[in-house]
């Protein structure tokens, strides 16, 4: 059994001390928010995972993984003298800001188990930290022009070129999905289609606060994220 991964030793100049640590983290293993319904509707002859929680909610395994990820940081902070060697840190020394309570609780259980540390959960409010683009706090300037420049830099200068360059990945995805269900194919006038056969496009909202890739690339991205979540969640007996 391999030893658990450790954080790199900080490079602190002689005579200096670390006064603050800021960590930015994304979500853990959660139930899907997109493409789950489409996946379940496909007649693929296989049973897909039952998550046992609502869309976007952290699973039990996801909570355990978050705790395991943050526990080494708590140990490292004690070694650095930022947390006491034993017992709980001062609540004034730790602050967590999150968009969901579930991930916040799992994080705190990992970094300082059984300690009552401060946090803030934004919930449904418009929080510029988590949804700056969507809520218009940070609109994209010349979004259409920027999207065109990105597309021009792709293989063959097009989304079709990008799809072609990802051929092996699409072959793997097509093997999992087989032909996509008829309703999806009919949107693109195909009687029986695979994901990579659907034309892709980039759409920019008039307000410049949303850029969406639709078609084959968009679907492939969504399904791939879903499969990553399923793989991370593991078998039912984990």
PLM segments and residue spans:
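Long, internal stretches of domain cores in catalytic or enzyme-like folds
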Residues: 1-238
């Amino acid at each position: 059994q391999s030893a658990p991964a450790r954080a790199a030793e900080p490079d602190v100049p002689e005579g200096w001390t670390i006064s603050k640590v800021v960590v930015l983290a994304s979500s853990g293993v959660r139930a899907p928010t997109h493409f789950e319904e489409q996946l379940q509707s496909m007649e693929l002859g296989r049973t897909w995972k039952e998550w046992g929680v609502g869309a976007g909610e952290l699973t039990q395994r996801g909570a355990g993984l978050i705790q395991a990820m943050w526990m080494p940081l708590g140990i490292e902070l004690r070694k650095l003298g930022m947390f006491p060697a034993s017992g709980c840190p001062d609540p004034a020394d730790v602050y967590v800001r999150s968009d969901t309570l579930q991930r916040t609780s799992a994080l705190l259980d990992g970094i300082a188990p059984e300690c009552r540390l401060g946090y803030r959960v934004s919930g449904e409010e418009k929080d510029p930290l988590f949804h700056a683009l969507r809520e218009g706090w940070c609109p994209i300037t010349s979004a259409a022009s920027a999207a065109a420049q990105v597309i021009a830099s792709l293989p063959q200068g097009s989304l079709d070129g990008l799809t072609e360059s990802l051929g092996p990945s699409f072959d793997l995805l097509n093997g999992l999905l087989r032909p996509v269900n008829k309703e999806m194919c009919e949107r693109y006038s195909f009687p029986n289609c695979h994901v990579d056969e659907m034309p892709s496009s980039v759409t920019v909202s008039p307000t410049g606060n949303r850029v969406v890739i639709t078609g084959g690339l968009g679907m492939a991205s969504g399904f791939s994220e879903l499969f990553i979540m399923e793989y991370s969640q593991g078998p039912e007996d984990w």
